[in-house]
A protein has these predicted regions:
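N-terminal Rossmann-like or analogous alpha/beta NTP/dinucleotide-binding catalytic cores
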Residues: 4-124, 135-136, 148, 211
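Short amphipathic alpha-helical coiled-coil/interface segments
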Residues: 78-79, 112, 224, 427-431, ...
Length: 557
């Protein structure tokens, strides 16, 4: 059994980049994090969920240029869109901010100055590709050419999609600028570097401190053996971002100020809510700092980020939880494969966010394995589990309580049937296991555990046949059996609904109304017993496969 004493926890999800819409791949992480945060809050832990849009970099500068608006206006528009998508999927941030903020500028500059003071920054002349027509240095993804290993054409400047090789942009054969099509020239420039190579001993010890999953530690060991390279933290103008102090025309690379955005978002939240920033970020803070990320940004979060914090005087993360990628029908998400789906397209066509939240939960665990959204399986599973089994319980039994017993439930202590009492007791006593699965992010195990009891409850209903009992209810024994059978089912259903609240919060709120209660905001609701119900109203509609097909079509035309 886990220790559930009151904790202080600051939780983050990776910052979505402000150059496009939220898609179903993004939502894996935000739903996973939101479930865990809701669980912690229902436990009574002081928990804050912080995020922000990642707003800096060349892609945003160029996108704004194409749309003939300022980068500031672009990221403002994207922020509104992102926030609406998250809200409609019931991802409940305490603060969703922006890295293009005064707080982030101040923190980035102060952290940089601390790194300089600690002799962790140096200047070096490097050679990069430069587009003479656009008059700018080209990031890796804005250069294409032939792969130096397999000779495949039109590959990006950092890696080959054909053979998987990684390389420097200057290794490309016949390189060209993605922006203008012209041949880039090599040009020397001075950049600022963080001495990551000097941090190997600290990072090697820190990454073994229990902060990371075993798979993540193993991956880091590979990087340690290969040797850590110093990190280029600067970019040349023109660039949308924060200018480096005392370095005109040089800007912080987006990956320096983006994670500092966690701090900035919390600082903004703390200032607006009279909280102490230092209580969560000072070096000896007793609060937990938990990052949820995708495995593709493990290098930044498990190496650059803790080293930056260590040598600028701030606390390090308590836990970093990395998850795998989403595939759709076994394929990588892409328009060319017909597997790219935005959050808004899902909402426009399927409408019910509970379905995706539940399906993702049924697939998620504590590993970095990829998970697949098989659209046919998705439709079958949510219809079977949520509609056919879970909501089937009140739809089969609550009507009898309203029609024959004035909406009153038999108190649990007065239920005489042995199997009925055992059923409720079993569901009540699995609370500790439910909480443990939530804490350890074993959501797949959790949903299986709950569904096993949902199935047992449906079997109980089928065995008792309340619809038959209702026909013979004039007999006292039959009338009592009908009342107790339906009350058993509804008491048990209510308990299971409380367990599922972090996963399907909106549906849980509707269920609480059935029992004339406020939305379930604590697992202590388990100890309270419902005494009567409202008349049953339809809680959920089946998912039509046609809606799934129209969702796919709308994003992949």
């Amino acid at each position: 059994m886990l220790d559930y004493l009151m904790r202080k926890i600051l939780v983050t999800s990776a910052l979505p980049y402000a150059n496009g819409s939220i898609h179903l791949g993004h939502l894996v992480e935000y739903i996973q994090t939101d479930i865990w945060v809701r669980f912690q809050k229902m436990q009574g832990n002081l928990t804050y969920y912080i995020c922000a849009d990642d707003t800096h970099g060349t892609p945003i500068m160029l996108m704004a240029e194409q749309e003939n608006i300022t980068p500031e206006k672009l990221v403002e528009n994207i922020h509104k869109e992102h926030l609406k998508d998250f809200q409609d999927f019931h991802v409940n941030f305490d603060n969703f901010y922006s890295t293009n903020s005064l707080e982030n500028k101040e923190l980035s500059e102060n952290i940089y100055k601390a790194l300089v003071k600690n002799n962790k920054i140096f200047e070096k002349e490097i050679e990069q590709f430069y587009d003479p027509d656009k008059k700018m240095f080209l990031p890796d993804r804005f250069i294409k050419g032939e792969c130096p290993k397999c000779k495949t054409k039109d590959q990006y400047g950092d890696s080959c999609e054909s053979c998987g090789s990684t390389y420097n942009p200057t290794d490309l054969i016949n390189p060209y600028s993605v922006l203008t099509g012209s041949s880039p020239v090599k040009k020397k420039t001075k950049h600022y570097f963080f001495k990551l190579s000097e941090c190997s001993d600290f990072l090697s010890n820190w990454t073994k401190s229990g902060t990371l999953q075993k798979e993540a530690r193993n991956k880091l060991e590979e990087w340690f053996k290969a040797g850590l390279s110093d990190w280029d933290i600067s970019r040349d103008a023109p660039y949308f971002g924060f200018e480096i102090p005392d370095a005109p025309g040089k800007f912080f690379y987006v990956w320096l100020d983006a994670p500092i955005g966690y701090m900035a978002s919390f600082k903004n939240f703390a200032n607006n809510n009279k909280l102490s920033f230092d209580d969560f970020w000072k070096n000896n803070s007793n609060a937990e700092l938990v990052h949820f990320i995708g495995k593709d940004i493990l290098y930044f979060h498990a190496l650059f980020w803790p080293a930056t914090l260590e040598y600028s005087g701030y606390r390090k993360p308590t836990k970093i939880y990395a998850h795998g990628f989403l595939t759709v029908n076994g394929e990588k998400m892409s328009k060319s494969r017909g597997t790219f789906i935005t959050a808004r397209s899902y909402l426009d066509n399927i409408k019910n966010p509970n379905f995706l939240r539940y399906y993702y939960a049924s697939k998620l665990n504590d590993s970095m394995e990829d998970l697949d959204l098989n659209l046919e399986d998705f439709s079958v599973k949510v219809n079977s589990d949520l509609v056919g089994k879970f909501i089937n319980i009140p739809s089969r039994t609550s009507g009898f309580i309203s029609k024959y017993f004035e909406n009153k439930l038999v108190p649990i202590k007065n239920i005489e049937d042995k199997k009925a009492r055992e059923l409720i007791l079993r569901i009540t006593e699995m609370k500790d296991l439910v909480l443990e699965h939530y804490e350890l992010r074993l959501f797949s195990k959790l949903t299986k555990l709950i569904m096993s009891q949902v199935e047992a409850l449906n079997e109980f209903v089928s065995t008792k046949e309340p619809w038959i009992l209702a026909k013979n209810k004039s007999e006292h024994k039959t009338n009592s059996d009908l009342h107790q059978t339906c009350s058993t089912c509804l008491h048990a259903f209510r308990l299971l609904s409380i367990y599922l609240t972090p996963i399907i919060p909106e549906l849980s709120s509707k269920i609480s109304l059935l029992f004339k209660e406020n939305p379930y905001d604590s697992f202590s609701n388990i100890e309270i017993e419902a005494v009567e119900i409202n008349k049953y109203e339809h809680l959920i509609h089946r998912l039509d496969l046609k809606n799934v097909e129209s969702m796919v079509d709308s994003d992949n035309k």
